[in-house]
Amino acid sequence: MTALAPVLNDIDRDLDNALERLFAFLRIPSISTDPAFAPQCRDAATWLAGTLTALGFETGIHETSLHPVVLAHAPKPGTPHVLFYGHYDVQPVDPLNLWETPPFEPRLATDAAGKTTIVGRGASDDKGQVMTFIEACRAWKAMEGELPCGVTILIEGAEEN
């Protein structure tokens, strides 16, 4: 069994690249409740599918009555299987005047206590969580060559509806 420390070290070493990938995802204004943003919801699904395919997942985009679902599999027979669920859609940004910076231009911010956070629509609900799981898979595969168990990832685009 692999020690976790090398995987965590790889995550730390690749932090700038991981943040760039997250920021690219956060820049997609995938507002599912506004039909005007349907193309951007599809863009988010396509971006995710490409990211997961590049990591070696068997990936598909599945149509629904609202926005596409991304389903990715990395089977590993004879091992436990993990299912990860998340969503790529975000809430509307109104009222826009309450944002200090454009909501789809993510940035790092430091608060008065010195804590660094990511500011941008979707950073905590739910694109940040989705990318945390994807980056963990990326780091594990970088260190071990394959995931330790079977993994299925389901990411939908209508949770905020």
PLM segments and residue spans:
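N-terminal helical capping/dimerization or prosegment-like subdomains
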Residues: 2-96
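Short catalytic-loop micro-motif centered on adjacent basic/acidic residues
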Residues: 60-61, 152-155
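Short, solvent-exposed coil/turn elements at secondary-structure transition points
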Residues: 65-67, 112, 159
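Active-site metal-coordination/substrate-binding segment of hydrolases
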Residues: 79-152
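Hydrophobic, small-residue-rich alpha-helical packing segments that form membrane-like cores
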Residues: 129, 155, 159-161
